[in-house]
Each structure stands twice: as structure tokens, then as C-alpha cells.
């Protein structure tokens, strides 16, 4: 296919155009008075959302080069989402501000590599400053505040997440599912999560989120490799008759068997997913036995004289719901409390008896997984459109609270970054020179961008607000919900330090990449050839036939 090649300024300008378009559509959602964005869906009702990364994923431009700019800045949002689960809009706005200022300097003759070096050093300095200023989270109230802000200032959601964390512990699993009523409810049930995702992405049932969700599935647990699909046939046939989904957790599934499962899944013959068993050696077996207890099934192992080809449907475990993504599997079970408690007691006894610290640690891990349970938040809403929006907000809120527990909190509302700008300028003037200093100053100017945007979305003058905040103490900032200057920590307007840090690092990384771009190679759009006119029957046959 023919390519189009663009160099220098023209290349960077084309990228900038795409970045502008994406940032504008995402930035309108920033802050407590941010607006919503409506996404058209090919099938079903349009989606009304307020989530930066979801909007970014939807944007595709006609112009290939501008689309490359969109993809670059989308990466800043996705990487922040992967690392911290929230703060995607802030990362996008920051990256945009850095790119704009950087391109002006490159156009004026500055060396892009030196600018990038300055930007990178500024990012390292700021990360250390954010860590310095982060306050650890100690009480439930702070957790509720972080959750409420991430869910779009919804105090009820914040409180619910704080309750969930209290019940299942800071490391516990909080799962989301669609409720049957108008209200959002919380329940704690038996369950566990382990760090293995699906073996093949073709098992995903929700391709937008790349997740496999199995409702009331059967679970086949085995500690051996599944090599031949013939071994599985009796079980698969029995399950196909019940019409229920199946999850296979095995040491491994080899190519032939995996291909057969995928084909059956894609053809709709059987809703099946497969996951590798977690752990190694004896620990793997013990964890599989834990899962067997949790799901009221049997571990099919040759030690017990059981073979997969002879497995009956009664030997399989069951669960209420299983969610699998590329990295983790969450099992929500119910109705097995007695067996789970007995198993936990058994693990505690083993912990008392063992001398090895390593074994104790691993047993403690297993106990936490089994005893902690899963907090299930059932999302309630009046319409499906509202349900989807609520689910995205809740997901952000859960991720943000976990990030806050990990690395602490900082003043929110763009305040932290704005307050760090003078410190960065001072440090850069002392430690950097020439074009590296210009690079660091680009970052210092960009740090005001999220605060300005939050203020503008609330109808205030962004530049005036940023200037006012700069002269106030570190924890004071602009409360866009009430249009006044307050102590952000006292008012509960807080951000997880991890979210602020990830957003900044990813924005600086993308900005550096865009500034050092000197050439773009993209596909030339294919010219659609005009169809020949099929006039009359002249010259024999009509022009509409393909001979």
C-alpha cells in the first residue's frame, strides 16, 4: 500500500491538530462542573459518559495523520488508567499543554532532544515532590472522600466504597455488577481473586472492556495440562445440554484443545473460558483445592484417582459470577460458608505448625484470599444509559481509593500541580541551563492547565484562579463546586498521589515523544474508483453484470 511521508514542522503540526481535537472533547468533563459527552453506538442506545479514557478510545478521525496524534495522546490516558485507574482527563490536559508549549519552542528553533531532556528531569523532580507532600490515608472518612470525588462528587458512592473496604480489608476485592433495582447496594459474599487472566483474548464476552463475564457458570478444576480435546468432550457435551457457561482452570491448555474451545465459544455452541491455575508446584495444588472448597466442586487430580475424561457434572464447582480480564480472575461464590470457614481453620493450623517464615507468608496470602471474601456493589439505575455511566464512575472511584491507600493523598482539584510550579521553576533555574531549562519551564507552565480547565468548566476565569492559588499555602485551592478558595484537605477535595504522579509521568513521556518527532509515515487513503455507468445494453450485455 502506498504511504504518505511528511517531515519537520508539517508533521508536528498535523499531530498537534489531532491532539487538540481529542483534548477538547475530553477536557469538557474535567472537574465537579464538567459536562457529559454522548457517544453514538452502532447498536443500542447512545452512551452518555463522563470518563476521559472511554471518550478517548472512541475518537477516530478521517485524516490518518491527525489520527496518529489522537492515538499518541490516547496512550497517555490509557497508561494512566492502567497504572492508577483514574486521572485520565488530567493526564490528557497536561500532555496537551506540554505539547503546545513545546511545539512553539521547536518552531522557534529550539533543539527538541534538549527540550525532552529538560521535560524528563522536571518530571523526576515533580514525582519526588508529590511523594514528599503525600499524606497517608488513615481513616474511613478520607477513603469516602476520595471515592466521592472520583465518582463525580457522589457522597453516597464514596461512603459505600469506604464500607466495602472496611469489610473486605484494604487489599480486598470489590466487584461491580448490574443490580436489579433503582438503588445501588453493597453486599459481602464469599469469593476470591487471583492473578491469572484468560489464556486467549477470544474468550472475552465484552469486547469493549476485554472482559469475560460468566453468570452462574460451572467450574472445572484440574492440576494437569489439557493436551487433547477428546479428554474434555464428555464434560463439554454434558454442559452444552445445561446451557450454562463453563470456566476451566488448569495447569495449561495446549494449542489443539485451546483452538477447539475458542471455535466453540465463537460459534456460540458453548460459552466457555479457560484460565491457567495460579502458583507453582504444591502451592498451585493447594490454591486449586481452596477454589474447590469455595465453589463446592472437586479438584480433578490423578493423586485422587480422578481423570478429566471421566469427570461428571457433579464434580464441577459452581459460582454466582466470574469476571476475567487479561490479568486477573474474580470468583464470586455463595452459600458455602461452612466449608470455607472449615478450610480457613485448617490453613490457620498449618500456619501455627510451620517454622518457615516463607511458608507462613504464603499461607497467610491464601487465608486472606479465602477469608476476605468479595464485596459486590450492585449498581442501580433507572435506565441502561444511566447504569453504564454509573458503572464507569464507580469503577474510577474504586480504583482511586485503592491508589490512595497505596501511596497516600494530596490536595485535589489541580491544586497540587499548580503549587509545585514555583518550586520546579526555582529548582530548574539552579540545576539546569540552556534548552534543558526551557524544557523544564514548559512543564512548569503546563502544571496550571488542569486547574485552569476545572475553573473554566465552572464558569470562572482560569488564569485568574491559577494566579490566586499560586500565592496561597500548599493545601489551599479553588473549590469549583462552590466557586471559592478553601483548604482542600479540610474540605475533602483530595486526589490519590498515585493518580497525580501517573498522570504527570505519562503526560511528560508523550510530550517528549511528540516534540522529538521529525517524520510521519502513514497510509495514503485509497481512492475509491467510480463504478462504470451501466447504461443500456449497448455493445452486447449491460454494464451491471460481472463476467
From Swiss-Prot:
Taxonomy of the source species: Bacteria, Bacillati, Cyanobacteriota, Cyanophyceae, Synechococcales
Pfam families: Cpn60_TCP1
PANTHER family (UniProt xref): 60 KDA HEAT SHOCK PROTEIN, MITOCHONDRIAL
Reactions catalysed: ATP + H2O + a folded polypeptide = ADP + phosphate + an unfolded polypeptide
Role summary: Together with its co-chaperonin GroES, plays an essential role in assisting protein folding. The GroEL-GroES system forms a nano-cage that allows encapsulation of the non-native substrate proteins and provides a physical environment optimized to promote and accelerate protein folding.
Transmembrane portions of the chain: none
GO cellular component: cytoplasm
The keyword Cytoplasm belongs to this UniProt entry's keyword annotation: yes
Keywords: ATP-binding, Chaperone, Cytoplasm, Isomerase, Nucleotide-binding
Name of protein: Chaperonin GroEL
Binding site residues for ATP: 29-32, 86-90, 413, 479-481, 495
Assembly with partners or alone: Forms a cylinder of 14 subunits composed of two heptameric rings stacked back-to-back. Interacts with the co-chaperonin GroES.
Family statement drawn from the similarity comment of this UniProt entry: Belongs to the chaperonin (HSP60) family.
Organism of this sequence: Synechococcus sp. (strain RCC307)
Swiss-Prot/TrEMBL GO biological process terms: protein refolding
GO molecular function: ATP binding; ATP-dependent protein folding chaperone; isomerase activity; unfolded protein binding
EC number annotated for this UniProt entry: 5.6.1.7
UniProt cross-references to NCBIfam families, sorted A to Z: GroEL, PRK00013.1, PRK12849.1, PRK12850.1, PRK12851.1
